[in-house]
Structures are given as structure tokens and as C-alpha cells.
Regions:
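Charged, often Cys/His-bearing segments associated with DNA-binding zinc-finger transcription factors
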Residues: 1-31, 38-39, 317-320
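Polybasic low-complexity intrinsically disordered regions
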Residues: 2-5, 53, 71, 75-78, ...
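Helix-centered, glycine/charged polyanion-binding patches within enzymatic domains
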Residues: 3-7, 11, 211-212, 217-293, ...
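Secondary-structure capping and boundary motifs in well-ordered enzyme cores
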Residues: 26-29, 48-54, 93-96, 263, ...
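An N-terminal domain-cap segment
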Residues: 34-54
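N-terminal core-binding DNA-recognition domain of tyrosine recombinases/integrases
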Residues: 46-48, 67-69, 108-109
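Alpha-helical support elements that line or immediately flank enzyme active sites
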Residues: 55-67
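Short helix-capping/linker segments at secondary-structure and domain boundaries
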Residues: 65-71, 185, 282-287, 307-320
Length: 320
């Protein structure tokens, strides 16, 4: 699919939105993802022909990048020409409506294709040497959900729960991720209610081939849990209070321990990058749907796209 107006012509000033679309147009493996989804996409033997699969996939990706609901996406086709161009839609032809966009998402959810989208992207990155498997860093973040009962059901989402972070309480879910300790690319995503402790899912975030695992102090005791992997050496952060008590000035051993903690922290920092991309770059700060299943599937798609965004410069350079 060609979008001539999206090419990376550096002599022309582009908006951030145009730049994002131009770069992602080149780094997303469209052909591989279309091949993945095609067996589950209708051929349109009856009634009006369906929109091109790649167009619908591009629309689905734009929803993730710009936090657009199905209705907002439909309306954006008329307000924002670059969205039409990116999806390969004729400005004078028919546009996918809210229901069409919804049905495409439901098809992805029904067949759990978000898992395969993440796997397909990561296979591509691994083949190019961008995703290694020697170590995994783990972390979790809270994703807010509506706490109001002013809705159709007159109640909050029963699959979301409150969790305390510092002195504040948050209502929602948790996104747990395992990332490549070298590149920071996400390989495993698990969604739970907000009250599940980070350490509970820690060992489930391993892909099975790593020799080392890294986590913050919330993962203390992970190597003693029933699901611990014997082949993995865990490097968990010291609790903040204990580290503050180190006498780095007068005790050489304490000074050495503090240096080790700094090294562990520098490796753990890689796990913050994907969270920053989906929250700040893509604007994902709260759940879009009710229930854990749909929101977890969306998270897997978001992290697949964040992986591509994080290594876009390497991918573009490799293309020449």
C-alpha cells in the first residue's frame, strides 16, 4: 500500500503526527500481519465487499497511536485527511463506519490475534538481532479505570480493583511486562486486577530462555516462590530503607553494595521505556473497555507497536 504523501522527505516540515505515521508506515511489517489475520477476515461473498484487510489493520493501529475510539476514528476520516491517506482510503469513496471498525476489533479479540501480532513483531526483531534472550527485566504499572458508578450497569467494573501506591489509592488494572534486559523490548504481557502484587506474576513474565532476571524491590522473594525457575538468577533491588542505611562513606563493603545496586538499577531502567512510550507517545493512560480480557489484548497490541517505535531508527537505517 503506497502513501506518497507520507514519505520521509526531510526537506518538508512535518507535524509530530505526520512524522509518526511516516515512520510507522515503513517499520510495521504490514505484509506479515495481513498474512496472519487473513484466515479470519471475511471474503465478502455476500453484500457489499469488505474494506481491504490492510486498510482495517492500519485503522486499528491508528486507534492505538492516537487513543481514538471507534466513533472518534470514524469521524476523524472526515476531519483529518492524513488518516484517510494512511489507511489507503479514497476521499470520495465510502469510509468504514463505527460498526465496521468495531467488528474488526472483535474479530481480533475472538481469535486472540493480539498475542500473535506481538509474537510476529518480535520474531522480526529477533531475526534482525534487535531482541536478545539472555536476560529479562520485569515491572508492572497501574492503568486507571473509571471508578464512577454513573453508567448503564450502575456499578464499577468488577474485574478492576483498588491498589495503594505510596499514600494514594488507584482503581483499575495492572499491566505486567517482561522485557529484554538489553534492548528494553517487551516479550511478555500479563493483565491483572490492580490489587495483584507485582511479585505474583514475576516468574510468569519470563520467556524461558533467559539466565538472569531483574526487578525492583517489589519482587523481593521471587526466587522463593513455588513457580520460581531454577535456571534463572534473580537480581532484585534492595529495599529503599535498607539501601539508605548503607554507610557508603566509611564502609568499603557498603560502598561496593551501593555500586552493585546502581548497576542493577541501570538495567532495570530499560523496563520503564515501553511504559513511557504507550503512556506519553501513544497517550494510553486509562482502560478503554470493561473487563481484563479486552484490555489485556489491547495492551499486547500497544506493546507490539511500542517495540517497533523504540527501534524505528535502526529499522529505517537497515532499509537504507
Amino acid at each position: 500500500m503506497k502513501q506518497s504523501s507520507l514519505d520521509l522527505n526531510l526537506s518538508t516540515k512535518k507535524t509530530r503526527k505526520q512524522e509518526l505515521l511516516a515512520q510507522m508506515d515503513r517499520v510495521v511489517p504490514w505484509a506479515a500481519l495481513v498474512e496472519l489475520i487473513a484466515p479470519y477476515y471475511p471474503e465478502g461473498k455476500n453484500g457489499r465487499p469488505p474494506f481491504a484487510l490492510e486498510s482495517m489493520l492500519r485503522i486499528h493501529c491508528m486507534q492505538q497511536w492516537f487513543t481514538l475510539s471507534d466513533l472518534a476514528m470514524e469521524e476523524a476520516f472526515f476531519d483529518t485527511p492524513i488518516y484517510r491517506e494512511f489507511a489507503g482510503l479514497d476521499a470520495h469513496g465510502r469510509m468504514p463506519d463505527e460498526s465496521t471498525i468495531l467488528r474488526f476489533r472483535h474479530r481480533l479479540e475472538k481469535h486472540k490475534l493480539a498475542d500473535q501480532i506481538l509474537a510476529t513483531v518480535n520474531d522480526l526483531l529477533a531475526a534482525q538481532g534487535l531482541l536478545l534472550k539472555a536476560g529479562t527485566a520485569v515491572d508492572a504499572t497501574l492503568i486507571a479505570a473509571p471508578s464512577s458508578t454513573k453508567n448503564k450497569d450502575k456499578k464499577r467494573d468488577p474485574e478492576m480493583h483498588s491498589s495503594q501506591k505510596g499514600n494514594e489509592w488507584h482503581f483499575g488494572m495492572k499491566a505486567h511486562i517482561g522485557v529484554d534486559a538489553d534492548s528494553g523490548l517487551v516479550h511478555t504481557v500479563i493483565g491483572t486486577s490492580g490489587n495483584v502484587a507485582d511479585v505474583v506474576e514475576g516468574n510468569s513474565l519470563l520467556h524461558g530462555q533467559e539466565t538472569d532476571g531483574f526487578g525492583d524491590a517489589g519482587y523481593q522473594g521471587i526466587d522463593k516462590r513455588p513457580d520460581a525457575k531454577e535456571a534463572v538468577r534473580w537480581h532484585i533491588a534492595m529495599r529503599p530503607g535498607k539501601r539508605r542505611a548503607l554507610d557508603k562513606e566509611n564502609n568499603p563493603v557498603d560502598a561496593l553494595i551501593d555500586q552493585v545496586e546502581k548497576i542493577k538499577a541501570s538495567i532495570r531502567a530499560k523496563v520503564e521505556h515501553p511504559f513511557r512510550v504507550i503512556k506519553r507517545q501513544f497517550g494510553y493512560t486509562k482502560v478503554r473497555y470493561r473487563g481484563l480480557k479486552k484490555n489485556t489484548l489491547q495492551l499486547k497490541t500497544l506493546f507490539a507497536l511500542s517495540n517497533l517505535w523504540m527501534v524505528r531508527h535502526q529499522l529505517l537505517e537497515a532499509q537504507g
